[in-house]
C-alpha cells in the first residue's frame, strides 16, 4: 500500500499515491473526465509561457493499436507491445526548436497524471516516440493524427481504469541536500 499524507493535503496525497498503471480494464474514460485531465495539462507551466505544445487525444482502440504497431515495428519490439492497452492515449508534443519543449511537456504530463489520479483513473508515461518521431513510418502515422511535422512527441499519457492496484515501490528519500 502507498504512503498517504495524513495532513489532509489533497495535492500531496495525490503525489504520494500516484503510480504507473500497466494493466487497464475496458471501462471507458468519460469525455467529462478527459476534458478535466486536459484542462490540467494546459494550465501547466511552460518556459516563457510559450505554450507551444499540442495534446493529441486518441480514443479509438484501433488507432491506438495502429500507432503501437508502427512503434513496435520501428523499435523491433515483441508482438505483444501495445502501450499496455490503455483506453485513451494523449500525445504530448512540442516544437522541435523549443529548447524547453521536453520540460514543458513533462510538466503538462505530470498535471495530467495527478488529475487522473484524483479522478480514480490510472495512467502511465510512455516515452518511446521522442527518438523515432522522424522515422518515415512513424511521422506518417503521427501526421494522420494531426501532429505537426515540426513537433517532437515527448511522451504519451496512457489513461484507463486500473485492472489491479499498482505496486507502490519504496522511494529513496536520501536524495535531498540542504546547502544553506
Which residues does each predicted region cover?
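Acidic, surface-exposed loops and disordered segments
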Residues: 4-180
Amino acid at each position: 500500500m502507498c504512503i498517504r499524507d495524513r495532513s489532509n493535503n489533497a495535492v500531496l496525497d495525490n503525489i504520494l499515491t500516484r503510480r504507473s498503471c500497466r494493466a487497464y480494464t475496458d471501462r471507458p474514460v468519460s469525455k467529462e473526465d478527459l476534458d478535466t485531465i486536459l484542462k490540467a495539462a494546459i494550465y501547466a507551466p511552460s518556459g516563457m509561457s510559450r505554450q507551444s505544445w499540442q495534446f493529441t487525444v486518441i480514443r479509438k482502440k484501433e488507432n491506438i493499436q495502429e500507432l503501437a504497431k508502427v512503434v513496435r515495428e520501428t523499435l523491433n519490439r515483441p508482438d505483444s507491445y501495445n502501450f499496455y492497452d490503455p483506453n485513451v492515449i494523449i500525445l504530448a508534443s512540442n516544437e522541435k526548436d523549443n529548447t524547453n519543449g521536453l520540460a514543458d511537456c513533462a510538466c503538462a504530463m505530470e498535471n495530467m497524471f495527478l488529475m487522473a489520479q484524483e479522478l480514480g483513473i490510472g495512467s502511465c508515461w510512455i516515452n518511446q516516440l521522442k527518438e523515432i518521431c522522424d522515422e518515415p513510418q512513424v511521422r506518417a502515422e503521427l501526421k494522420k493524427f494531426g501532429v505537426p511535422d515540426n513537433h517532437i512527441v515527448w511522451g504519451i499519457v496512457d489513461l484507463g481504469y486500473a485492472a489491479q492496484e499498482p505496486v507502490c515501490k519504496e522511494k529513496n528519500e536520501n536524495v535531498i541536500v540542504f546547502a544553506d
